[in-house]
């Protein structure tokens, strides 16, 4: 598979050999669509699509049709519903609109009908703005109980687009006595204020839903659009929403369905590949070739996606193995040393990627959006979840998040296997404590080693699990690397089920204050078993939510 994908998207045989060697050394991994579809006729090598729902009968039905094709060719979809008029608003025929949610219900069924490839059903995340009159109901659409069953969308994921005005209102409401936290819900068609609610009440409901179901995802609209390339701002382009895994932040409109192809470097081996000058440039070239393949081969039903890919040629080079690198080098996640290395890593990746896209602009031509003719690719970096790719890469840590356990039982079709943290195993071996009993204790303690007397306090710091780490450090690291990430990051947060509500609020406020662009899942307990998605949407303890496999890479 490595050879097939490398050959399909390389410039020449030498480039293909280098890509194969990099993947064989586990220095990087192709995204699932690139690895699965490269060199075949099965589907497209694109991970993510973002489309915009127009406020018209034609716009909505066109959205359904486009979703069918995008999903069938293997991509996860994020759709923006913020422009669709709300329930009760007049239509062009003089009747009253049923609102956006019943139309989302159709997409909910559509995703069951259209599969990605052979085995996986379609995956879709609907996004709605925090000012939309239906946002209160939208927060609950994934809960199977309460409300009209015909307005529930339990097969979809969902995200809320939040502006600075809302977050500033929440900040003032929690710091100023008697502050009026009135929040206007405005119909996007008529611009009429449909309802006035308490911003704090809406915020509490949003956080409560994240604790109970892991969602909605959050996109901080102003931070995202402030970071849009100047040449796209001059064209009036705007990012309305994110994707299924919250790492893609590309402009969409009536003409553009955003496209992004992904693959990820393995930071666990940063010390090795950072010494190879051609490594990052080779990956940028490969991803640009993936885009070119899509532009040339996508069917006519994907015209909006082809147009967007042609105009901006955005790619998403991501990363995994961040925590594994720290453990390999005995660096605690919660440390200045980890912060320094984090900055060094992503500065290196961005500099090399930027150098290569400028070289490609000279060699192949700049993307049409760039009227200054400086870059081939409008966006270069995006950090995807990487759950599957991290397993392929020797069970390295997924994406930029901490390990959720130092030992867990992984369930596969072949049976159940005990997965151990290899660096912890090496440490225990050096202490003569690499025994079955010790590992059974670790599993019994949900993957934690804090109870082991054989480890020093410093060693326990290095092997803290995700839920044991102060979540502010996840935000700090994400904020520091965001400077180098053109798009966004799949940032997961981890809390115990009995988390203090003030702490939950403060971490989310910190994410906004530190200019993070998006937040992905809120996971309410450290994982003690492998990805085994529960069909139950609401649960007291969330072990694992479903990641979009298309975004793996």
Give each language-model segment a name.
Residues 14-19, 76-79, 118-125, 218-220, ...:
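Flexible, glycine/charged-enriched surface loops at secondary-structure junctions
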Residues 46-267, 271-272, 301-306, 357, ...:
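Active-site cavity-forming subdomains of large catalytic enzyme subunits
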Residues 15, 42, 56-60, 95, ...:
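Secondary-structure capping and boundary motifs in well-ordered enzyme cores
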Residues 1, 43-44, 80, 115-131, ...:
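Conserved alpha/beta enzyme-core scaffolds, especially Rossmann-like or related mixed alpha/beta domains
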Residues 239-251, 291, 295-296, 381-540, ...:
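Catalytic alpha/beta core of large soluble enzyme barrels
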Residues 1-47, 51, 178-179, 203-207, ...:
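Acidic/polar, glycine-rich intrinsically disordered N-terminal extensions of enzymes
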Residues 254-317, 327, 437, 444-468, ...:
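Long, charged, mostly alpha-helical binding arms that flank functional sites
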Residues 20-27, 31, 190, 280-306, ...:
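Internal maturation/activation junctions in enzymes
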């Amino acid at each position: 598979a490595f050879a097939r994908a490398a050959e399909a998207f390389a410039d020449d045989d030498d480039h293909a050999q280098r890509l194969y060697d990099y993947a064989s050394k586990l220095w990087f991994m192709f995204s699932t669509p690139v690895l699965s579809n490269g060199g075949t006729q099965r589907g497209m090598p694109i991970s993510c699509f973002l489309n915009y729902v127009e406020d018209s009968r034609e716009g909505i039905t066109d959205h359904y049709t486009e979703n069918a094709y995008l999903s069938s060719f293997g991509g996860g979809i994020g759709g923006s519903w913020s422009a669709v008029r709300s329930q009760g608003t007049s239509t062009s025929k003089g009747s009253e609109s049923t609102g956006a949610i019943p139309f989302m219900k159709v997409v909910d069924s559509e995703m069951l009908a259209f599969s990605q490839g052979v085995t996986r059903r379609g995956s879709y995340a609907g996004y709605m703005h925090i000012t939309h009159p239906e946002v209160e109901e939208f927060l609950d659409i994934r809960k199977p109980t309460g409300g009209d069953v015909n307005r529930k969308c339990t097969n979809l994921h969902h995200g809320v687009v939040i502006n600075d005005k809302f977050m500033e209102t929440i900040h003032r409401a929690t710091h100023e006595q008697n502050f009026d936290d009135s929040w206007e819900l405005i119909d996007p068609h008529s611009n009429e204020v449909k309802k006035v609610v308490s911003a704090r009440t809406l915020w509490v409901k949003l956080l409560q839903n994240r604790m109970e179901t892991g969602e909605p995802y959050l996109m901080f609209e102003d931070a995202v659009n402030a970071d849009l390339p100047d040449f796209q701002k001059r064209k009036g382009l705007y990012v309305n929403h994110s994707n299924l895994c919250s790492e893609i932040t590309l402009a969409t409109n009536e003409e553009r369905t955003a496209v992004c192809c992904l693959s990820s470097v393995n930071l666990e081996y940063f010390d090795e590949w950072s010494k190879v000058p051609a490594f990052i440039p080779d990956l940028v070239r490969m991803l640009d070739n993936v885009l070119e393949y899509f532009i040339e081969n996508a069917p006519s039903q994907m015209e909006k996606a082809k147009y967007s890919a042609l105009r901006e040629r955005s790619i998403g080079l991501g990363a995994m193995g961040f925590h594994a690198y720290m453990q390999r080098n005995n660096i605690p996640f919660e440390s200045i040393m980890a912060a320094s290395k984090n900055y060094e890593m992503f500065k290196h990746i961005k500099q090399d990627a930027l150098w290569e896209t400028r070289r490609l602009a000279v060699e192949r031509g700049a993307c049409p959006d760039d009227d200054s003719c400086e870059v081939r690719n409008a966006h270069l970096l995006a950090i995807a979840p990487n759950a599957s790719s991290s397993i392929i890469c020797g069970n390295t840590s997924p994406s930029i998040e901490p390990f959720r356990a130092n030992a867990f039982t992984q369930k596969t079709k072949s049976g159940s296997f005990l997965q151990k943290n290899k660096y912890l195993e090496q440490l225990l071996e050096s202490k003569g404590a690499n025994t079955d009993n010790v590992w059974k204790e670790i599993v019994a303690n949900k993957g934690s080693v804090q109870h082991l007397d054989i480890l020093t306090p410093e060693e326990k710091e290095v092997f803290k699990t995700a839920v044991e780490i102060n979540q502010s450090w996840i935000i700090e690291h994400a904020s520091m690397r965001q400077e180098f990430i053109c798009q966004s990051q799949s940032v997961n947060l981890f809390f115990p089920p009995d988390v203090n509500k003030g702490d939950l609020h403060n971490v989310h406020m910190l994410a906004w204050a530190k200019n993070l662009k998006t937040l992905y899942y809120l996971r309410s307990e450290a994982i003690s078993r492998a990805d085994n998605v529960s069909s139950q949407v609401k649960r007291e303890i969330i072990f694992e939510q479903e990641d979009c496999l298309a975004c793996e890479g």
